[in-house]
Amino acid sequence: MMKKLIMLLCVLAGGAHAADNTGLTATVAKLDAEMFDAFNHCDKPGQLDKYASYFDSHIEFYHDNGGVTWTRDVMIAQTKAHVCGKYRRELVAGSLKVSPVKDFGAIATGSHIFCQVGGNKCEGIAEFTLIWRLRDGVWQVTRALSYGHRANN
């Protein structure tokens, strides 16, 4: 009898964690969509600042081809110079995975493709990892990795 009770408690606890993770996944998916909507329109007034607001001022951004960026200001300047009005990012459907980080936030991983603005060419695909921190009710990315860049065949 005790064994069955312990098993039931384990199943219920696992179900509670899954429900919590479902809510967390929905939150991070919404943040991802909002952040990259601003990224995709960063050539429009106010959108680059909106995109920047999703990142901690001391963001560490690791890009397999571009190297490491150590601050939000430098990352945003590079985005403005090389991305805005030229490329848009699309999340690969079904690829987003979110895991909680106790007393901090979440880790999001997935795949994304990059398409030329004004055309249908989506030539690049890569993997990403975003470390999201929740502090004082505000979610921000503290670390970002974009890697495994390759042709999207």
Language-model regions, residue ranges each:
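Repetitive helical segments and hydrophobic/amphipathic motifs
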Residues: 12-13
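A solvent-exposed, acidic/Ser-Thr-rich amphipathic alpha-helical stretch
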Residues: 26, 46-104, 113
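A short, structured loop/turn motif at beta-sheet edges
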Residues: 98-106, 132-138
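Short, low-complexity N-terminal intrinsically disordered segments enriched in polar/charged residues
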Residues: 5, 16-57, 153
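Short beta-strand edge/turn micro-motifs at domain boundaries
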Residues: 125-152
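Short beta-strand segments that buttress and anchor functional surface loops
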Residues: 109-116
